[in-house]
Amino acid sequence: MDKKDMEREFYMTGGDGKTSYARNSSLQKKASDTAKHITLETLQQLYKETRPKSLGIADLGCSSGPNTLSTITDFIKTVQVAHHREIPIQPLPEFSIFLNDLPGNDFNFIFKSLPDFHIELKRDNNNGDCPSVFIAAYPGSFYGRLFPENTIHFVYASHSLHWLSKVPTALYDEQGKSINKGCVSICSLSSEAVSKAYCSQFKEDFSIFLRCRSKEMVSAGRMVLIILGREGPDHVDRGNSFFWELLSRSIADLVAQGETEEEKLDSYDMHFYAPSADEIEGEVDKEGSFELERLEMLEVKKDKGNTEGDISYGKAVAKTVRAVQESMLVQHFGEKILDKLFDTYCRMVDDELAKEDIRPITFVVVLRKKL
C-alpha cells in the first residue's frame, strides 16, 4: 500500500460507538499521562525562554477521542501558570492550536466538543483572564509539510510516529508477494530482510518528519514525541511487537477454522515499527536540525484500560487494537470476522500474560530546534 492509499484508508475508528477510538484509547492516555510531567515541563521552559505574544501549538496524530481536547487544556493551563509567574503584568498570549491527522480522521467529533471546551475554559478562569484560543484542523500526513515556515513553537505527537508512511516496499518480492508470510508485522517467524525493511522505512520517514518540522518551527521551539519502542537491538521481544505477533496468530486461528483465507493473512502487512532508543537518537543526530534534550524510556503500568466494569488486560488491549486497526482490517478481511477475531485475540493476550509478562516500552523524546 503506497502513501496515498495509506493516507486515505488508515484512521482511528470515529464517533463514540462501542468500538470507537474515543471509547477505547485509555491505554494511550495512561502512557501520555505517565509522560505528562515531561511534556508540561518542556512547554513551560519553552514559554519561559521565548515569551511569544502568539503561541503556535501543533498536535500531530491528534485522533478524535477525549484525549485531544484534554491535552490542549493542559497545555493552556501550563502556559498560564508560567505567564503569571514570569510576566504577570503582560496580557496572556493568544493560542493557535493546529490539530493534525490523516484525512479520514473524525475531526467533526472534536469540533462538536468545542463549544463545551470554550465554556469550561471560561469557567476555569472565572470568566475573567481567559486566553484567546483558536483551533483549526490540518488534515494530511506529517511525513510532509503541513504549516508555513516559522509558525510553530511547540509540537506534540503522542502515539503517532511508530506508524510509518507506508508498508515498506522492500517487503515485497518481484511478483509483488509479501516476504513476511504468516505475520502482519515483525514477528518471530520474520526473516532478517523483513526487520531491515521496516527499520529502513522508519529511518527514512523519521528523517523526513524532522526535516519538515524544522522548516515549520521557530528557533528554540520544542517537540515532545511519545513513541512505542523496544528496549534493545532485537526486533522481536515480548513488548510492542509481541502484540502484533498475537494478532497474526489470531488471524491464523481463523484461517484454520475456515473463517478467512490463508492468502489474506499472508498479504496483510502493517505499517508499524517500534524503534530502539539508538535508532531514534541516530536519526536526530544525522538529520541535524534538532538537539536531543531528553530521551526517556517508560514502562507504563498495566491497567484494565476501561471504565465499563472489570475487564481483563487482554480485553483492554483487544479494544485498543481494534479501534486503531479496524479501518484497515475491514478493507482487507471484511467486517464479519472482526468480533470473532478480537475475541480470539483477547484470549491469546491473557493466556500469554498468564505464562510470562508482556512489557511494552514507550519512549518520551524531547527535541529543541537549533538556532
Curated annotation (Swiss-Prot):
Keywords: Magnesium, Metal-binding, Methyltransferase, S-adenosyl-L-methionine, Transferase
GO MF annotation terms: metal ion binding; S-adenosylmethionine-dependent methyltransferase activity
pH dependence remark: Optimum pH is 7.
Residues holding (11R)-carlactonoate: 28, 162-163
EC number, UniProt record: 2.1.1.-
InterPro entries, alphabetized: MeTrfase_7, MeTrfase_capping, SAM-dependent_MTases_sf
Leading EC class: transferase
Cofactor(s) the record lists: Mg(2+)
Role description: Methyltransferase involved in the biosynthesis of strigolactone natural products, bioactive compounds promoting plant fitness and soil microbe interactions, but preventing shoot branching. Catalyzes the biosynthesis of (11R)-methyl carlactonoate (MeCLA) from (11R)-carlactonoate (CLA), downstream of MAX1; MeCLA is probably biologically active as a hormone regulating shoot branching and serves as a precursor of non-canonical strigolactones (SLs).
Family: Belongs to the methyltransferase superfamily. Type-7 methyltransferase family. SABATH subfamily.
Complex formation: Homodimer.
Protein name listed in UniProt: Carlactonoate CLA methyltransferase
Gene behind this protein: CLAMT
